[in-house]
Amino acid sequence: MTILSEIVDYKEQLLKDGYYHDKLQNLKGVKHKNKSRLTDALIKNDNLTLIAEIKSKSPSVKAFQQTNIIKQVSDYERYGANAISVLTDERYFGGSFERLQQISETTQLPVLCKDFIIDPLQIDVAQKAGASIILLIVNILTDEKLRQLYQYASSKGLEVLVEVHDGIELQRAYQLNPQIIGVNNRDLKSFNTDVKHTNQILKCKKENYLYISESGIHSQQEVKQIVKSGIDGLLVGGALMNCNELEHFIPSLKLKKVKQ
């Protein structure tokens, strides 16, 4: 069993146990007034759009540098991040919907609920906790379920980041005609990363979509390796969580876009 399939089994069990129903009942809810949209930033910015991530741990990293989460988000915003990504999985990533709610209340930036969504109820909880964007991972969903969840989230006014890991998944994503497609540089079996994965997958990309490179980005040099693939943005997590010089590091990642 891969780590990913283990996580999905865990989500299915949480659904059966009423975890998400309880969250929906108990979260106080966050209003979305004046939130900017990720799509607008991706389209309008001449430089790469940055989604800066908050997480405490991952299956490949036992713990990231301890920090005041609200200050971290404030620093992300101050130094040029365009959106915030929040891991809400508790067991594997040390996140929570309460953290998502807290962050959503303190920033005007769009907020991505980064989780392993397999049911509409999870989308309801994410939105109530303040998310304006949700993640759908093509690898863990059938075409029918992917379309159902995409349409459901869109009908609720949420933006959707559709994540792919290979060329076959990219073609499946195109069937939705989504605005935003994320290319994850992480190998789902080993959880190792290689940023050149973005270049390989986007060799066969279609125009008129917005592309984000996700995971494994630790330096400007790595961004230089992938910017020519035609990406519009980056999602960076671990490197930001462990960084003590965000005022320099964040601007260094936001290179000028290269459109083909």
Curated annotation (Swiss-Prot):
UniProt KW Lyase keyword: yes
Pathway: Amino-acid biosynthesis; L-tryptophan biosynthesis; L-tryptophan from chorismate: step 4/5
Secretion signal span: none
GO biological process, one term: L-tryptophan biosynthetic process
MF GO annotations: indole-3-glycerol-phosphate synthase activity; phosphoribosylanthranilate isomerase activity
Name of the top EC class for this enzyme: lyase
Keyword check for Mitochondrion: no
Catalysed reaction, written as an equation: 1-(2-carboxyphenylamino)-1-deoxy-D-ribulose 5-phosphate + H(+) = (1S,2R)-1-C-(indol-3-yl)glycerol 3-phosphate + CO2 + H2O
Pfam families in the record: IGPS (PF00218)
Highest taxon above the source species: Bacteria
EC number(s) reported in the record: 4.1.1.48
Keywords tagged on the record: Amino-acid biosynthesis, Aromatic amino acid biosynthesis, Decarboxylase, Lyase, Tryptophan biosynthesis
NCBIfam families: PRK00278.1-3 (NF001371)
Similarity comment text for this entry: Belongs to the TrpC family.
Protein's recorded name: Indole-3-glycerol phosphate synthase
UniProt source species: Staphylococcus haemolyticus (strain JCSC1435)
Taxonomic lineage of the native organism: Bacteria, Bacillati, Bacillota, Bacilli, Bacillales
